[in-house]
């Protein structure tokens, strides 16, 4: 089975299992509470719409849009045309970590953003490979799909955390037996919801990792000769992140690694070779939103070799 067909099969399987698991758990919860199913469905749709509408403004803060004529915009425009999707709006983000991301909706316009540190550490080929990955997310509607599948675990998680916090507060300040029992009940229900959230997140994260791999697949098949550059881009991001020093109390970056082009290129190539020969457990990234870098690099090179 080739890489593309395998990814599509696994995405169908993981997506189906995620929807079934979320459906069963939601049905059990609303049945116990006694809320009509139709009201629950309407409530979820409204929440999804609110999230869909406001997310671009939250994600897009601290960004600056670039337009036609800007080199970054022209790269994205070329990739979008070859991917057969409308050109998204293009932004430079002034976040402190090297990253690129796709976001937006049909009202605000689909968007692609690249952080300034990423622009500083990648060469032209690596940047094109990364942007092809992000355009792949837009082509595959990953923003909308990911938001929909993540909605139910998010709601259950918020309710669970609220009950746990309230339960502990009641226990701490309990003035009589009723408040003590109520606090214990909230802790018990909150604990159950926490476990359910964790289990659902396992499914959602599995699906998310496959969508990331599918975006890698889009980049590597659109520009097959640039697959190694996506690998070195991942390595440079990893190296940069490992060398960032942050304040342990505020999380603010104290120092970031200086950009040394020759050393950066050599270190990235060495890390890619390490990943290619590294044995990774199937469960190494079970709690991660993205596949382990070694898995991503191995897939990219398998596409390059036509296996």
Swiss-Prot record:
Ranges that cross the membrane: 7-27, 38-60, 145-165, 180-200
GO CC terms of this entry: plasma membrane
BP-aspect Gene Ontology terms: proteolysis
Cofactor(s) annotated in UniProt: Zn(2+)
Active site: 134
The enzyme's E.C. designation: 3.4.24.-
Family per similarity comment: Belongs to the peptidase M48B family.
Name of this protein: Protease HtpX homolog 1
Organism whose genome encodes this protein: Sulfolobus acidocaldarius (strain ATCC 33909 / DSM 639 / JCM 8929 / NBRC 15157 / NCIMB 11770)
């Amino acid at each position: 089975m080739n890489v593309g067909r395998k990814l599509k099969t696994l995405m169908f399987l993981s997506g189906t299992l995620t929807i079934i698991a979320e459906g069963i758990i939601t049905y059990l919860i609303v049945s116990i509470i006694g809320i009509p199913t139709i009201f629950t469905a309407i409530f979820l749709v409204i929440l999804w719409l609110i999230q869909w509408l406001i997310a671009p403004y939250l994600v897009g803060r601290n960004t600056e849009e670039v337009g036609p004529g800007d080199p970054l915009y022209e790269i994205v425009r070329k990739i979008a045309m070859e991917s057969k999707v409308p050109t998204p709006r293009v932004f430079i983000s002034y976040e402190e970590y090297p990253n690129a991301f796709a976001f937006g909706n049909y009202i605000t316009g689909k968007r692609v953003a690249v952080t300034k540190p990423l622009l500083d550490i990648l060469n032209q080929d690596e940047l094109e490979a990364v942007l092809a990955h992000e355009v792949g997310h837009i082509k595959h509607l990953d923003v909308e799909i990911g938001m929909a599948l993540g909605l139910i675990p998010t709601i259950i998680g918020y309710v669970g955390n609220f009950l746990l916090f309230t339960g502990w507060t009641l226990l701490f300040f309990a003035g009589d037996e009723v408040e003590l029992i109520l606090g214990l009940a909230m802790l018990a229900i909150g604990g159950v919801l926490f476990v359910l959230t964790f289990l659902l997140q396992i499914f959602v994260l599995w699906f998310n990792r496959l969508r990331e791999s599918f975006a890698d697949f889009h980049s590597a098949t659109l520009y097959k000769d640039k697959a190694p550059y996506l690998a070195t881009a991942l390595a440079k991001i990893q190296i940069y992140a490992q060398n960032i020093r942050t304040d342990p109390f505020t999380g603010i970056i104290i120092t970031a690694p200086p950009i040394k082009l020759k050393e950066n290129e050599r270190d990235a190539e060495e890390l890619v070779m390490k990943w290619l020969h590294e044995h990774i457990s199937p469960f190494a990234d079970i709690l991660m939103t993205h596949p382990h870098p070694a898995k991503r690099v191995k897939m990219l090179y398998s596409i390059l070799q036509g296996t």
